[in-house]
């Protein structure tokens, strides 16, 4: 049934709680009943449905922020959502090799409905406290879709989207993301190294309180999405503490990263704050902006965001492999302790430490922001061209920043971490290269178009 305006009761579709307790057959029957029941209504629709991939990328961003997920945890969440949406959409009209779920959907199933349900199902699993608002959004999305698609097609798409989300969720349940059983305290956790120079330890808070234990040590050994192992592109060790390059990095931080009396301009202080938010979400906003401008199709969007977010997830795993391999100290520790007593500056405070987040609670090398951003920039440059202009907003600082290329953006992100006083420049530059290497690998090994037979065996070892 297709008409201009529908008022629905979408109650049957509210498979609240743990949806996996409802059998597939019973669930599908309920969905079919629902979509054809166009009577009493709690949802009003008067406009055509938007692209559900872009719509639910926006819903995902909102849910991640509301859920308070860290940038590290967010890389896994956005990959779960985008992988599910991609395999759901591609499974109905297979144009690419699947990431995980073999295409097995009814040919009449709605790709749009499948995308909506796949994204919804993952988000409710990750953020059960948001199930009511997510369900309301899902119902509105399906109601808008019924303006242009038949009820049986929508029902089949919803059932397929749920099937794919269940499969992706089950696949990644055993990826090693469970929190570590014991806190990681850096040199205090490494036998024979307590107090050793150059090694990370919990960094003091701006208010003088003790710092938190290392965040996400389990990510260092998490099963990657596409990489064969977390260490596939492991970086060389950090700069030697007695090297001139390290001295250059350290001196730059002393002047440019300090809270007060720095050599920063106002714009440099602002950009450090601007980029202090949830990095994966910045790149999803950028991708959505460019997709809209270029008019990408549903399938193209599903593929783009899956490549983007799976690449960022594997980049984060590769980054954490390096962090917990080398356990390198943060600038605040390096500058306060010094290599010698004469070199120490115990009163030094980084610019970002008086703002939410401050110095991140994990080892310094390599930079997480720069690794993830290098990965994202590689994927988006491949899709839209390196010298593509775009702008981006921040959830933690007002204003909009604009760029003429993706390299310009990643260079500014490196500046932001240095000017914030939380990363050495070399760490950011090497991290950017790491992220690009990961994204290149992912794009050549996963979700390739049928007929794309690029040789990729040489870098599997």
Where are these regions (language model features)?
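Bacterial N-terminal signal peptides
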Residues: 29-41
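Short, flexible coil/linker elements and helix-boundary hinge sites characteristic
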Residues: 15-16, 41-42, 146
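N-terminal secretory signal peptides that target proteins for export/translocation
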Residues: 1-25
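Alpha-helical and His/Cys-centered functional microenvironments
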Residues: 10, 35, 373, 460
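Sec/Tat signal peptide C-region and signal peptidase I cleavage site
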Residues: 43-47
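Structural motif marking the loop-to-transmembrane transition
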Residues: 25-26, 111
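Acidic/polar surface patches and capping/hinge elements
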Residues: 48-453
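Glycine- and aromatic-enriched low-complexity segments, predominantly in secreted/extracellular proteins
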Residues: 452-461
């Amino acid at each position: 049934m297709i008409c201009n305006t529908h008022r629905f009761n979408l109650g049957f579709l509210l498979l609240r709680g743990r949806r996996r307790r409802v059998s597939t057959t019973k669930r599908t029957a309920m969905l079919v009943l629902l979509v054809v029941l166009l009577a009493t209504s709690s949802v009003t629709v008067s406009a055509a449905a938007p692209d559900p991939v872009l719509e639910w990328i926006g819903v995902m961003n909102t849910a991640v922020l509301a859920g308070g997920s860290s940038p590290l945890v967010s890389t896994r969440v956005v990959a779960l959502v985008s992988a599910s949406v991609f395999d759901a959409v591609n499974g109905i009209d297979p144009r690419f090799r699947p990431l995980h779920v073999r295409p097995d959907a009814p040919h009449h199933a709605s790709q749009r409905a499948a995308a909506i349900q796949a994204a919804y199902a993952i988000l409710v699993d990750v953020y059960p406290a948001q199930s009511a608002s997510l369900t309301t959004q899902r119902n509105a999305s399906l109601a808008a879709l019924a303006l242009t698609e038949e009820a049986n097609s929508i029902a089949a798409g919803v059932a397929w989207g749920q099937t794919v989300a269940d499969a992706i969720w089950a696949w990644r349940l055993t990826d090693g993301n469970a929190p570590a059983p014991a806190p990681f305290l850096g040199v205090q956790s490494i036998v024979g190294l307590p107090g050793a120079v150059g090694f990370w330890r919990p960094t003091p808070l701006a208010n003088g309180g003790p710092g938190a234990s290392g965040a996400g040590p389990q990510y260092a050994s998490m099963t990657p999405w596409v990489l064969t192992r977390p260490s596939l592109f492991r970086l060389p060790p950090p700069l030697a503490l007695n090297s001139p390059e390290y001295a250059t990095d350290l001196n730059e931080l002393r002047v440019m990263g300090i809270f007060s009396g720095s050599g920063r301009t106002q714009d440099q202080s602002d950009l450090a704050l601007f980029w202090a938010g949830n990095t994966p979400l910045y790149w999803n906003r950028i991708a959505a902006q460019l997709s809209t401008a270029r008019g990408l199709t549903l399938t193209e969007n599903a593929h783009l965001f899956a490549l983007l977010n799976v690449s960022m997830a594997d980049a984060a795993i590769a980054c954490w492999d390096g962090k917990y391999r080398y356990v390198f100290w943060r600038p605040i520790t390096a500058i306060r302790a010094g290599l010698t007593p004469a070199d120490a500056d115990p009163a030094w405070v980084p610019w970002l430490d008086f703002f939410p987040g401050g110095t991140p609670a994990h080892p310094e090398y390599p930079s997480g922001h720069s690794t993830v951003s290098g990965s994202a920039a590689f994927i988006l440059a491949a899709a839209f061209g390196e010298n593509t202009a775009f702008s981006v907003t921040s959830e933690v600082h007002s204003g909009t920043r604009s760029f003429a290329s993706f390299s310009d953006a990643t260079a500014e992100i490196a500046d932001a971490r240095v000017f914030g006083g939380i990363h050495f420049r070399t760490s950011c530059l090497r991290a950017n290269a790491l992220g690009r290497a990961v994204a290149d690998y992912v794009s050549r090994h996963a979700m390739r178009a049928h007929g794309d037979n690029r040789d990729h065996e040489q870098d599997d070892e």
